[in-house]
Each structure stands twice: as structure tokens, then as C-alpha cells.
Regions:
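Short helix-capping segments at alpha-helix termini
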Residues: 61, 267-268, 377-384, 448-452
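Conserved active-site segments centered on acidic
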Residues: 352-429, 496-502
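Short, well-ordered alpha-helices that flank and scaffold nucleotide-derived cofactor binding pockets
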Residues: 56, 162, 337, 341, ...
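A short, structured active-site edge motif that brings together acidic residues
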Residues: 66, 71, 388-393, 456, ...
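Phosphate-binding/catalytic loops
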Residues: 432, 442-502
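S-adenosyl-L-methionine/SAH cofactor-binding core of RNA-modifying enzymes
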Residues: 256-266, 273-277, 409-410, 414-430, ...
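Active-site-adjacent structural elements in enzyme catalytic cores
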Residues: 1-352
């Protein structure tokens, strides 16, 4: 089969060419097209023969469900057995967009499309070419990513051509995609909504719209290959480059040292090595190929570049890839989900085993002392020394009287609470430092040149809270009480995270 490639400007659609593409879908053929996430491989979702062609062209296991792409909410009502109220709320908030919802399937959807499941995955893409193609075809379009199964997903038409030329009727070249990782998938068939695949839309965003808890499938990060997949990407090795890939996790200093050690040992074996890094770290690596995902602060860039870089490694014919990890605050879980699958869950953990926590604020007499007292009230799986320090301490002072009153009223002793100046010698390689405010973290890093910045955290940011712990100084006793409650809630999250990592 000869694959026709057409170029379409998404801002100025060529209606004749788009109709040609739509007619191919209607005739049972396959057409690759851009979406806002990755390129999709489309066929008539209600035609079992078209779905079989998709599986065949990709080399995709037939129990791996396909996502049905629609152009109007009424299409969901056509193919779902029932439409949950949660689906209506989420569609109002996020469609068209990178969100796939799993609902019970209606009789119109063949099992060939759902991988034998009684559920169907549905989304409305936010891309003018994709939406126009659905409408012109007169079909609902089943579309997984347009790549050979197991390879990195395509973010530009050239990637599709590399994998699928000669296997499908047409490729619509609409330029590079915007997001670069697949849609979030949420299962709405159970009482509690569950994210089965992380993406650009986070569980927190979903929970806010629904007004209730949204849980995360524990298999998202785990190497679990035993369950029948309810959504794409839950089973089988995914997104993988041809080279063996290993992720190195830990603080920046330890990751760089470990990767360079691995590069040296593999170079001795005559292997061509690539390192996946960031703009901030790329200059520290001595490898044959060093590829940057962009700035670590730019999560969108990291997501957008991931699949392109994995394909670049294939083109450069490297033998081994060592990559930094990318557990960024907002969509880091989605990025790491893809990276772990690409690496076959091969991870080297270089994290230091911390044995001490220092809480730091300004004077050493208030929030940091409350944090110390509260933290000692919790149980850590691995005991740690808990200290409190101030950034500006002229002489030892007892804890603030109002803070003391609040602590005592909550059954926490203040007997040994005296302000102490933070010194560089307090911070060893196995110390975690938590500040109450971003400015305090910056001051510590500026003052102590020899400490690792990755050991110093803003407490609220570390646990995923948006607001910093407010300073109650000068306020009423009630203000100190509110500060205590805020600290306790935040520290409960800290303990949960620390215990999960032990």
C-alpha cells in the first residue's frame, strides 16, 4: 500500500484534502492525524474491521483498548450505555481537550474497538484538524497513537511515516503537536473516579471540578503487567526506544555523579551512550550524546520533548540511554509514567537516606519550634532527629509565648525549645532542611555555598500545597492556633511522604 502524505495548515484548512481524508475513514481505511497530544491512527470506531486494521498496522495486542474520538457531546450519548453525571461535569470543564473518560459501552461499539471490554474510552480532541476529520468522515474515530506498538509516540508526521508508511492509507501532516504526551484517562464506571493514565489534566484538577476525591491507580508507577488493561498504556512495554534505557533518580549532585560513573563503565565496553538531561545539567555530562529536555522549571517543555528525544536516540543509534528523572510538581507523574514504561521500570535510586530534619524560619522562636513539636508527635517508620533553627538569632530565647500556649494546649511540651542560629555545620549530607517561606530557602542557599540546594525545601511546596505557612507574629492567640492547625495538616502530609519512601 502506498501511503499518501498531505500537508494541512490547522489555521487554514484545505477543505478538499480534508474531505478526501474523511472519505477514506468512511471507506474503512486508516488515516493518521494530529491532535493536541500526539498523532493518532484513526479508523471508523463502529466498524470492527477498521479496528482490526488499526491493531494490525501498529502490531498492537488486541486486548489493548482503543480510544474513541468524538466531535460533539451528543456522540458520547450515542455510544455509552449511560452517561454519568460526572462525565457531563468533566466535559463542560475539559472538552475539547486532553481528557479521556471511560464509561460503560453501548451496543453500537464493537468489542474489536474496546479490546473485549464492556467499557469504552472516549475523548473530544482539541485540534481543528482532528475535529474536522471526525465531522467530515461522518464517523466516530477510534485512534491510538500513530506508531508501532511499544515505540515512542509520534509528535510529528515524520515519526508516523517512519513507523507506518506502507501500512496505512494517509498521513495528515499538521505540524508538531502542542502537548506531547497522551491524554489523561479517568475511569467513571466505579463509585470513586480513578485516574488510569496520568496526563496534562491532573487528579487535583479533576477533583476540583467533581467536588470529590479522585484516586490514582496504584499501577501507574508500578511495574504491573498482570491485569487486563481497562485503558491504553496500562499493560505491555510502552513508549520504548530501541536502546536499553535506565533512569537515575535522586538529588542533582548524586544523579550527575552516578550517570557519569555509568557512562565511563559502559564506554569501556565500547557502547555508544546517550544521556537525557536538562538545560541546567547538560554541561556536566561526558557522554557521546547529551540531549536536553529543556529547563527543569518548564514542565510543558519536558513533556513536549520527551518522545522526540527518545526517537532522536533511535536515529543516533545509541546502545544505552541514561536519563535523569523528572518528578516535576504539576505533570511530573505523567512524565515519569511514560519514562518508566520506556525504561521497562529500570531505575537506579541514588537518594541519600536522611536521618535529620531541621525546620527553619526567621527568629527560631515560633513556626519552626511549633513544627518541631508537632513532628515529634508523629511516628516515622525510620526515626529521624528533629531540630528547629532561626536565620537571625542574636541570643538564645524561649519559644514565643502565644506559640507556647498553643503547643501546651495541644499536649506538646516546650521544655527544650530555645532559639538557635542555623549554622552551615548543622547541615550534613543526610539532613533535610524545611523552610516556612521561599525567601528563607533562598537565603540559606545564598549564605551556605557548600550545601546542596536539593537538600533545602519549602515545606508547603514539598508536600504539594499551594500556600506557604503564614507567620502569625503580632497576631492574636487565635492566629497562632490557626498556624498550628495549618502546620499540623502540612506535617501530616510530610510524614506520609517520608514513610512512603522508606
Amino acid at each position: 500500500m502506498e501511503t499518501k502524505i498531505i500537508k494541512i495548515d490547522q489555521d487554514n484548512l484545505d477543505h478538499k484534502l480534508m474531505q478526501e481524508a474523511g472519505d477514506l475513514i468512511a471507506a474503512g481505511e486508516l488515516v493518521a492525524f494530529p491532535t493536541e497530544t500526539v498523532y493518532g491512527l484513526g479508523g471508523d470506531a463502529l466498524d470492527p474491521e477498521a479496528s482490526k486494521k488499526i491493531y494490525s498496522a501498529k502490531g498492537r495486542p488486541s486486548d489493548n483498548p482503543l480510544i474513541v474520538h468524538i466531535s460533539d457531546f451528543s456522540d458520547l450519548e450515542r455510544i455509552a450505555k449511560t452517561v454519568p453525571e460526572d462525565a457531563r461535569k468533566l466535559s463542560d470543564a475539559f472538552w475539547p481537550g486532553p481528557l479521556t473518560m471511560i464509561v460503560e459501552k453501548g451496543d453500537a461499539v464493537p468489542y474489536a474497538t474496546t479490546g473485549g471490554m464492556d467499557t469504552v474510552a472516549v475523548r473530544m480532541p482539541n485540534h481543528p484538524i482532528a475535529l474536522d476529520l471526525i465531522r467530515r468522515s461522518g464517523c466516530l474515530i477510534a485512534a491510538p497513537s500513530a506508531n508501532t506498538s511499544g515505540r515512542p509516540s509520534p509528535t510529528e508526521a515524520a515519526h508516523v511515516a517512519e513507523d507506518l508508511s506502507g501500512k496505512i492509507a494517509m498521513i495528515i501532516d499538521g505540524g508538531p503537536v502542542g502537548i506531547g504526551i497522551e491524554s489523561t484517562i479517568i475511569d467513571l464506571t466505579e463509585d470513586t473516579p480513578m485516574v488510569l493514565r496520568p496526563g496534562y489534566i491532573t487528579p487535583q484538577m479533576l477533583s476540583k471540578v467533581l467536588g470529590k476525591e479522585v484516586v490514582i491507580d496504584p499501577g501507574i508507577i508500578a511495574a504491573d503487567d498482570t491485569r487486563k488493561p481497562k485503558a491504553p498504556g496500562m499493560k505491555y512495554k510502552h513508549y520504548a526506544p530501541k536502546a536499553d534505557m535506565v533512569i537515575v533518580d535522586g538529588t542533582r549532585k548524586h544523579v550527575i555523579a552516578k550517570i557519569n560513573e555509568l557512562v565511563a563503565s559502559h564506554r569501556d565496553d565500547g557502547k555508544k551512550i546517550a544521556v537525557i538531561a536538562t538545560e541546567e545539567t547538560k554541561q556536566f555530562y561526558d557522554a557521546d550524546v547529551v540531549l536536553s529536555m529543556g529547563s527543569r522549571a518548564d514542565e510543558d517543555s519536558i513533556a513536549h520533548e520527551l518522545y522526540r528525544i527518545l526517537r532522536d536516540c533511535d536515529e543516533l543509534d545509541v546502545d544505552v540511554i541514561f536519563s535523569e528523572s523528572f518528578s516535576t510538581p504539576r505533570i511530573g507523574q505523567a512524565i515519569m509514567n511514560r519514562m518508566l514504561k520506556a525504561a521497562g521500570h529500570q531505575v537506579i535510586d541514588t537518594h541519600v537516606k536522611y536521618d535529620k530534619i531541621i525546620f527553619v524560619a526567621q527568629t527560631g522562636t515560633c513556626r519552626e519550634q511549633m513544627a518541631k513539636g508537632i513532628m515529634n508527635d508523629f511516628v516515622l517508620k525510620v526515626p529521624m532527629e528533629i531540630e528547629a533553627r532561626g536565620l537571625v538569632v542574636q541570643f538564645p530565647e524561649p519559644v514565643n509565648q502565644k506559640a507556647e500556649a498553643v503547643l501546651i494546649s495541644n499536649g506538646i511540651s516546650t521544655e527544650d525549645m530555645v532559639s538557635t542560629q542555623l549554622e552551615e555545620s548543622d547541615i550534613t549530607e543526610t539532613t533535610m532542611v524545611f523552610t516556612m517561606e521561599s525567601s528563607q530557602r533562598e537565603r540559606i542557599i545564598e549564605s551556605f555555598a557548600d550545601i546542596d540546594p536539593e537538600q533545602v525545601f519549602v515545606l508547603s511546596q514539598y508536600v504539594g500545597d499551594e500556600l506557604e505557612i503564614l507567620d502569625p507574629y503580632g497576631g492574636t492567640l487565635q492566629s497562632y492556633g490557626l498556624c498550628y492547625e495549618s502546620l499540623r495538616a502540612t506535617l501530616k502530609k510530610l510524614v506520609k511522604r517520608l514513610n512512603a519512601n522508606t
